[in-house]
């Protein structure tokens, strides 16, 4: 069913709905990259609710990723023209689409976890989203720092160094937001 709905959305995009959505998002963002990223993230969260991973990617790749690539290419940040690689845009939209699985109110993963823990699905979804703040920040890094996705990295040692620094940064950020490092922080 979800894949069929993804096919309907892709069909609508091929009929010109994608251009209408792009112009609407362009008007809403007003050329502000942060507003553009926020609108794209919210659209990905809304469109990704209740979808399996494959259908989620099909929808994000056909609706939100082209918007991000097309509109971000004309934005200048601190005197430098922003160029968003296609892979960074796809990862950005896909991450937020997948985040919809544990974000209330739909949050299918939160409902499953709440049934196991015998708690409220909404409270479980909110707690899960707080644990996923790292996942909400990481796609922003894909857009502004292409090294994290190894875009333009020429040497293996540099790639290994970036990998370990990214893992260390994500672990540090997760321990900060969750209140744990080696022991519970009070």
Predicted regions and their residues:
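Core transmembrane alpha-helical segments of multi-pass membrane transporters/permeases
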Residues: 1-17, 37-50
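Alpha-helical transmembrane segments of multipass membrane proteins
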Residues: 8, 42-46, 66-67, 71, ...
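Membrane-interface helix termini and inter-helical loops of multi-pass transporters
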Residues: 12-28, 146-156
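Hydrophobic alpha-helical transmembrane segments of multipass membrane transporters and ion channels
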Residues: 1-5, 30-39, 130-138, 169
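Hydrophobic transmembrane alpha-helices that form the pore/transport pathway of multi-pass ion
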Residues: 53-96, 106-123
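Juxtamembrane and boundary regions of transmembrane helices in multi-pass small-molecule transporters
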Residues: 95-185
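Membrane-helix interface "capping/anchor" motifs
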Residues: 46-55, 179-186
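Alpha-helical transmembrane segments of multi-pass membrane proteins
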Residues: 33-47, 74-99, 123-134
């Amino acid at each position: 069913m979800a894949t069929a709905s993804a096919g309907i959305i892709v069909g609508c995009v091929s009929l010109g709905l994608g251009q209408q959505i792009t112009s609407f998002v362009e008007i809403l963002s007003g050329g502000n990259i942060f507003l553009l990223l926020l609108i794209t993230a919210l659209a990905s969260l809304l469109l990704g609710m209740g979808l399996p991973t494959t259908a989620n990617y099909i929808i994000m790749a056909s609706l939100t990723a082209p918007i991000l690539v097309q509109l971000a290419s004309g934005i200048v940040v601190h005197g430098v023209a922003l160029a968003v690689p296609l892979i960074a845009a796809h990862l950005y939209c896909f991450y937020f689409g997948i985040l919809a699985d544990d974000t209330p109110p739909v949050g299918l993963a939160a409902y499953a976890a709440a049934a196991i823990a015998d708690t409220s699905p909404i409270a479980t979804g909110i707690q899960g989203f707080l644990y996923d703040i790292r996942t909400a920040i990481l796609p922003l890094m894909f857009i502004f720092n292409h090294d994290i996705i190894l875009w333009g990295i020429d040497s293996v040692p540099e790639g290994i160094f970036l990998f370990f620094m990214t893992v260390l940064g994500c672990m540090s950020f997760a321990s900060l937001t969750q209140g744990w490092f080696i022991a519970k922080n009070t």
